Amino acid sequence: MIIAGIFTQDVSTGGGYHQGLNALLQMQALCNGKHEFIVFTTVPANEPILAQAGLKVRVFRTTLRDLAVFLLGSFPLLLMRLRWLSSFEKKLLGENIDLVYFVHPSLRATLLQRLNYIFTVMDLCHRDFPEFPEVRNTGAFECREQVYRAALPKAVLILADSSELKERIVRRYGVEAERVLAMPFQPSLLLKSGDNEAAMAEAQSVYQLPEGYLFYPAQFWSHKGHIRLLEALVLLRRNQGDCPSCVFAGGDHGNRRLVEQKVVEFGLQGRVHFLGFVPSGHLAPLYRRAQALVMPTYFGPTNLPPLEAWSLDVPLLYPEHLRGHAGDAALYFDVDSAESLAGAIKKIADPICRERIVAAGRVRLKELSAERMSAEVVLVRQLDVFCGRHMM
């Protein structure tokens, strides 16, 4: 059987890119010579990166025919009568693909009329927190709903990264529970490339950061809660005369200017450092020099940075409503309360508290690894079942 992995993210998307790359490498390992695995990407710059990782790669582009098939998707009987296939599906069929694996949610799944597919759901936060502009504005909510309602019922398998997310998928979209597999993510495999003394020295030379800062690697979206962290720093400075430094690393999706304005308004110019998007090789050094990873984000139920922090022995400050992800491996706070976050920041300065959280992080990472390996056994079995049915 030949499986196609569809990878349409570029490196600037951050966590989504790393999760997708992990998923591709995982699938290749699970195929283990039994099945052939080929990656298809719309981003030409991904080709050398994927090839260097040992993956077979094909580059494709979206065509006007794909758009026409998508628009006609509301009239499936007409499509059947016209016998129109998208250029996307034609390319896959031309490569003798048997099964398509979407490592990210994708409208392209709705273009497939003959080929079966595995679909990945990263989150359902447009339903959990519809009040944020990145979900509410410009039709983002409607677009996500359209994709999920059209693609999920026809998927031979749906991958979610937690049992919490699996339950929400089943409840909200009416798919059968046995067709949804909860399989935890793993830390970015690219993180290891910067976990060495040479990378540490290079990163320090580039960024010139103080020791013991609070680290928040996140794109600048409203739901990421950067401003809540600034408010907490103001409270700490007011109550104890000083506050720790904070380092933001991530690309801008429209909210950075507001965060920068708040830094000036709060008088935190000397305490907050904006690094922008940083290369993968600098992430581990930035984690290693941090006092803690702080994530005042609303979206979940899981996130990638906690896995990275646990793998590098960095303590985690995490929202209470995401406790299902981190278990005992975080110090929690109310994401709607600057006072609560300030209290957590104050507590994490205690070495005993830090060591407790770090030790729990090691345990949590092992627990998630065991869950992932169990899910991989199920996934391999599902691939074998599909292969047997597909060849009939």
Language-model region placement:
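Carbohydrate transferase catalytic cores enriched for Leloir-type hexosyltransferases
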Residues: 1-392
